Amino acid sequence: MNVLFVCEDNSALSIMAESILNSVAPGRFGAYSAGCYPNEWLNAHALEFLAQHRMPLANSRAKSLELFRRPGAPRMDFIITLCDVAADAQFAGWPGDPFIAHWHVETDDATGDADDVLRDNFWTLMRRIKIFASLPHGKLNRRLLERRALTLRPSYL
């Protein structure tokens, strides 16, 4: 099963989510990330944090959402948006009719400490992705699986 994590710029949140899923469920999922408006660079603090936690970083580069709409792109089973900009993106008519879920991850912090926000986001994503990966994919019908995936939204965690 293929999962595409989408955020605004594909520089931190979606890169972390891709890396986490590849780490917690190797071989079970194809994890990908993209941005609605991808940066030219990745967040150096996010990459450093992932490396410190021994998370895989293969193919880590900012990618456009449009890359995954093209013919020959991997067929997505799930598209998970991580910010409001990504949630507003148009996924109607996406090839393969993937299930779309929005897991808003808060990126603003009143203290202004970017490292604290990054750390909190990493552990929030880790919890949600571990639960997502533990769902019996392939054994539940699509509607039941979709309902369970939706419970991973912030109001439930």
How would you name each of these model-derived features?
Residues 58-62, 85-92:
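Short, basic, helix/turn surface patches
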Residues 9-11, 84-87, 107:
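Short glycine-rich anion-binding loops that position phosphate/pyrophosphate groups of nucleotides
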Residues 78-83:
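Acidic beta-strand-to-loop metal/phosphate-binding motif
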Residues 74-75:
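Alpha-helix C-terminal capping/helix-to-coil transition sites in glycosyltransferase folds
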Residues 1-69:
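Conserved active-site segments centered on acidic
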Residues 89-157:
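Phosphate-binding/catalytic loops
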Residues 24, 32, 42, 52, ...:
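Short, surface-exposed, charged/polar-biased interaction segments
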